[in-house]
């Protein structure tokens, strides 16, 4: 109260080791392949000091992460708005003693919003993957990267698309985590 900056999240009663572990493992999974390419001398070059870059890996990874922009937009609209709207109504009704009919209706809407959101993310990401597969050879050629790296781009695009789906599912699970109620 009246503080400009608060570190209440670090209080022991608000610290959830399982959530910390999930976040840590999620981020390690995202970054481990990059560190492998950056710090394996045959696939990387020194940039400044201990920083390294891998031209053959970094550009396909960058392109694959560009391909998730449509899926992230759908995620933001469907999960972070539609689902959260019904989530809030559901828990407000539960806490304030709403009718069983209304609570069940909000639960059904919440489930429907999740189904719609995940379905739309899957459709949009599949389309983004297919477009990247088709445009991949031209993209690599325009960037001066050998077409031998096309399979790497394909794997990265599919992986990035799956990452969007995993992030959406984890987000729903985090919302439904009842420790914070």
Task: Give the ranges of each region predicted by the language model.
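Short runs within selected transmembrane alpha-helices of multi-pass transporters and secretion channels
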Residues: 1, 132-134, 151-181
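Hydrophobic alpha-helical transmembrane segments and immediately flanking/interface helices
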Residues: 39-59, 128-149, 157
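Transmembrane helical elements of multi-pass membrane transporters/channels
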Residues: 1-80
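Short juxtamembrane and helix-loop transition motifs at transmembrane-helix boundaries
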Residues: 113-119, 144-151, 171-176
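Specific pore-lining/lateral-gate transmembrane helices of multi-pass inner-membrane transport
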Residues: 58-140
């Amino acid at each position: 109260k009246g503080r400009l900056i608060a570190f209440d999240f670090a209080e022991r009663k608000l610290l959830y080791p399982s959530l910390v572990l999930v976040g840590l493992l999620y981020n390690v999974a995202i970054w481990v392949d990059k560190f492998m390419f950056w710090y394996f001398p045959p696939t990387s070059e020194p940039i400044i000091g201990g920083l390294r870059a891998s031209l053959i890996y970094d550009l396909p990874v960058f392109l694959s992460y560009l391909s998730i922009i449509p899926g992230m937009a759908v995620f933001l609209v469907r999960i972070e708005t539609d689902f959260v709207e019904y989530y809030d109504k559901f828990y407000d009704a539960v806490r304030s003693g709403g009718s069983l009919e209304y609570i069940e209706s909000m639960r059904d809407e919440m489930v429907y919003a999740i189904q719609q959101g995940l379905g739309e993310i899957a459709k949009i990401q599949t389309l983004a993957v297919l477009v990247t597969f088709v445009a991949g050879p031209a993209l690599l050629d325009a960037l001066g990267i050998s077409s031998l790296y096309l399979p790497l781009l394909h794997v990265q695009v599919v992986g990035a698309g799956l990452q969007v789906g995993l992030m959406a599912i984890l987000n729903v699970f985090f919302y439904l985590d009842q420790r914070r109620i």
